Structures are given as C-alpha cells and as structure tokens.
C-alpha cells in the first residue's frame, strides 16, 4: 500500500519514490521528510506498512511511475532483502535513463555503503549469507552505482530539520528540470495534435464531436474566448453535426499526425482540464451540480452570471465531452459502439438547446 501526495499542476508531475528501512526512522526522520515534501507540493510515493511482502511486479511498477528516487541509507537498510531488491530495480531504471536517484546517507558514511563496511556492511553480509551468489552480485553492483552518485549526508551534530530542508531544495531543483522537459514535450504533442485535428475535422464531417473539443482544449490554453469562435464555426459549417454511420469504426479513421492509441489516453485528461478552465472563466458556477440557466432571475446578485446563448451551449458541450471521455476510457465495448454513445450525448445536447441549434445551423 502506498500513499501518494495530491496533484498540483496541469502538466503531469514527476513522482518521488522514497526507499528506506527501519521503524526508528519511519516515525521520525521519514515522517518529517514526507510532511516537508507535501508542504512544497511534491508528489511522492512511500510505503505505509513495514511488512511489504515480496511482490517484485508491484515494486517495479511503483519505481517506474517515478522520475526521482530518494534512497535513505541507514545502518539497517542492508538488512532488508526487499530494500536491496528495490535498489537493483532502481539501477535498471537508471541505466535506461528513466530514473534519477539521490542517495541520502542518514548517519552512515557513503564509503561504508559503497564498500559494505562498518555497521552497514555487517548487516549486508549477514543478509548475503542467506542469499544466492547472483543475487549478492546484483546487490553489490546496485549499492556501488547508487552510493557513488551525488548525494546528501547527515553527520553527527547536524540538525535534521536543516537536513530535510536541504533535501527538499535538491528535489525541487531536480523536478524543475523534469517539469521543463515535460512541458516542452507537451507543447510538441499539442502542435502535432492540433495540425492533425484541423485536417481531420475538415476532411471527416462524421467524426465524433469529441475530436473537435480536443482541438478546442488546446486553443483554450491560449485564449479562453476562442472557444466561442470554435463553437460558432462548428455550428455554421455543420462539422460533426451529422449522425455517424452505424458501422463507423473510429479505428479506421485516418487523421494525419495522430496516434489514436495515444490520443484516447490524452483525451480524458484534456476534457477534464477544459471543463475546469471553462467553468472558472464563466463565473460563479459549481462544477459539481447541473447548471440551470432557464428562468434564472438575472437581477439577483446571488444568481449565476448571465451567459450568452453560445456560452450556454459551450458549457453543456463540455459536459458532453466529459461523458464521452469517460465512456471512451472506461467501457469495454467496441469503438463502433463508443461512437454511438458519443452521438447519443450529442443528440441530447441538440434537444436541450434546440432553438440555438436550429438558428446556428441555418446561418
């Protein structure tokens, strides 16, 4: 079981994996470190239970989900077979350049960890006597690899509070590098996706509306009001207003510049963020309840903000896309049936705003 700190940014935030051993530091140093990471909005993964089992598949998954690992070497670290297996997996990820490890030497010397000497070495060799030769070799290589990296040490007489501040500062510095890289990658994907969606929406009038809204999501990052122009354009030109064919296969649609497998994974997050941004831009609207604009007294100071008709359609359409994204990701039906679900939501939207729909289509 792991505890993951909450999300704080739109761009996916790299997680920090904490590896340690010992009840004596769990309720002291580790708990204070975890509190500090959470205060600074740093996502982290930490095992709640001291008895962690031997599920290496789960172990590898937790490490692979992280971009940074803090290995807290203490005198008892090497007595744990599970901890030693953790750093072996970390070394594999480091070799593949998928993980950055920061060794933290908590009241142990770095050379004792690397050379398996001192109190740390005694624990290691005691464990080695109960283990296989190939396993011992992997542990030794992992210890040397990780302990020789640039790390932080807590020596005698140093304040743990100051030491924790130094650790958090270093983690923030490292994460800033990853976040910058992720933002650049995200921007490149955005440009590629936009080009493909513009061409695809023009070429395939029977595409589900969700494709258009993904396009809107990226435009809305630059200007929230651009969404009105997109809606007006879609209504006037009749894009994606026609029902899909019964045998529509989303998989068969060719959209230049789009990998549909990656697209469906990106869509749910895109729709959620679009919905949140739109709700915030439109005023005092509670996203957790349906918004009823009909017969709303507009002269009351406590009533929701009065919205133009197109914005009402925009708001409802984002709800539609949220439903569509959910079904796309959650159902196990074929993509042809998913297309029918999207059209079902679109038909409900048309009926709710029939006057607006009829007027804009005639333009």
From Swiss-Prot:
NAD(+) binds at residues 21-26, 53. Residues 12-175 form the TIR domain. Induction: Accumulates during immune responses activated by a variety of NLR proteins. It is found in: Cytoplasm; Nucleus, Nucleoplasm. InterPro entries: TIR_dom, Toll_tir_struct_dom_sf. Keywords: Cytoplasm, Hydrolase, NAD, Nucleus, Plant defense. One of its GO terms (biological process) is NADP catabolic process. One of its GO terms (cellular component) is nucleoplasm. Its EC number is 3.2.2.6, 3.2.2.-. It catalyses: NAD(+) + H2O = ADP-D-ribose + nicotinamide + H(+); NADP(+) + H2O = ADP-D-ribose 2'-phosphate + nicotinamide + H(+). The active site is at residue 86. GO terms for molecular function: hydrolase activity; NAD+ nucleosidase activity; NAD+ nucleosidase activity, cyclic ADP-ribose generating; NADP+ nucleosidase activity. Gene3D superfamilies: Toll/interleukin-1 receptor homology (TIR) domain (3.40.50.10140). It is an enzyme of class 3 (hydrolase). PANTHER family: DISEASE RESISTANCE PROTEIN RBA1-RELATED, TMV RESISTANCE PROTEIN N-LIKE. Homooligomer; homooligomerization is required for activity. Disease resistance (R) protein that specifically recognizes the HopBA1 type III effector protein from P.syringae, and triggers cell death. Acts as a NAD(+) hydrolase (NADase): in response to pathogen-recognition, catalyzes cleavage of NAD(+) into ADP-D-ribose (ADPR) and nicotinamide; NAD(+) cleavage triggering a defense system that promotes cell death. In addition to ADPR, also generates a cyclization variant of cyclic ADPR (cADPR), termed v-cADPR, for which the cyclizing bond is unknown. Also able to hydrolyze NADP(+), but not other NAD(+)-related molecules. The TIR domain catalyzes the NAD(+) cleavage (NADase) activity. In contrast to classical TIR-NB-LRR receptor-like proteins, only contains a TIR domain. The TIR domain mediates NAD(+) hydrolase (NADase) activity. Self-association of TIR domains is required for NADase activity. This is Disease resistance protein RBA1. It comes from Arabidopsis thaliana.
């Amino acid at each position: 079981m792991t505890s993951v700190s909450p999300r704080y940014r739109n761009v996916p935030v790299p997680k920090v994996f904490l590896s340690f051993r010992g009840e004596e530091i769990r309720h002291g140093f580790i708990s204070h470190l975890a509190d500090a990471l959470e205060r600074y909005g740093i996502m982290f993964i930490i095992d709640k239970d001291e008895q962690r089992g031997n599920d290496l598949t789960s172990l590898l998954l937790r490490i692979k989900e992280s971009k940074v690992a803090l290995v807290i070497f203490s005198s008892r670290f090497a007595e744990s077979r599970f901890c030693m297996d953790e750093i072996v997996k970390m070394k594999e990820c480091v070799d593949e350049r998928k993980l950055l490890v920061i060794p933290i030497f908590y009241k142990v010397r770095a050379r004792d960890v690397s050379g398996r000497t001192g109190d740390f070495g005694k624990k290691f060799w005691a464990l080695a006597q109960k283990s296989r030769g190939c396993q011992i070799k992997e542990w030794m290589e992992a210890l040397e690899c990780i302990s020789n990296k640039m790390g932080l040490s807590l020596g005698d007489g140093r304040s743990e509070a100051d030491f924790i501040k130094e650790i958090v500062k270093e983690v923030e510095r490292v994460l800033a590098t990853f976040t910058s890289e992720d933002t650049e990658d995200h921007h490149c994907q955005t440009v590629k996706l936009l080009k493909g969606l513009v061409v695809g929406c023009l070429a395939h009038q029977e595409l589900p509306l969700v494709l258009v809204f993904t396009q809107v999501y990226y435009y809305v990052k630059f200007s929230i009001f651009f969404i009105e122009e997109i809606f007006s354009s879609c209504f006037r030109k009749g894009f994606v207003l026609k029902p899909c064919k019964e045998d529509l296969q989303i998989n068969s649609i060719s959209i230049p510049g789009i990998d549909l497998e990656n697209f469906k994974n990106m869509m749910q997050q895109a729709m959620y963020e679009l919905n949140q941004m739109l709700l915030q831009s439109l005023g005092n609207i509670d996203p957790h309840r349906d918004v009823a604009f009909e017969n709303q007294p507009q002269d009351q100071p406590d009533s929701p903000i009065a919205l133009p008709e197109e914005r009402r359609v925009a708001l409802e359409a984002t709800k539609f896309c949220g439903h569509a994204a959910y079904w796309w990701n959650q159902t196990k039906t074929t993509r042809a049936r998913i297309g029918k679900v999207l059209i079902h939501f679109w038909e409900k939207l048309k009926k709710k705003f029939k006057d607006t729909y009829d007027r804009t289509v005639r333009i």
